[in-house]
Amino acid sequence: MIDLHTHILPPQLPDLRRLTGYGGWVSYEDESNGCKRMVIDGKAFRTVEPNCWDAEARLRDMARDGVRLQVLSTVPVMFSYWAQPQHAHDLARVLNDHIAEVVAAWPTRFLGLGTLPMQDPARAIRELERCRRDLGFPGVQIGSHVNGQNLDDLALYPIFEAAQELDACVFVHPWDMLARDRMSRHWLPWLVGMPTETALAACSL
């Protein structure tokens, strides 16, 4: 079995609030059970288990579930399209380098998809080129929109043209979904919100 949709994070993240001078970034808080709580400006976002950052724990899960190969990509909240482009690019490099390290250590078990600072097409293209040429990734993961821009926005075309020239696949992942404030119950974000966001992105293209 090949699992195309798996997310991974580095075991540690840079203190981006301190480094950039503003908030909105994900940080970790260690929990007593060995998990990590993802926190944004002091507010809990999600708790992740060791298999989210520990490749050996992930390999044990793969053996249990009969998965031969995983395609690794970052957790979409890390896209950071809202941030200043240089800072988003710096974070993308950290995330992509970590994925590349995991793939290099277990090249028969993992492939990687990079992340790009999509709010700045020139930077996104540079990072896309690095992902393909230096890190050896087959492609990248991008969000279903970029700060409200649908993926058919003309400003984004150069990124897709570069992906075509580089023979890079593009995995579109839903994020920052529509009508979030109306979907707090009944698993509606996953049953309705994410599929709707994906459909909107696909139809835009």
Task: Please tell me what each predicted stretch does.
Residues 1-205:
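Helix-coil boundary/capping segments in enzymes
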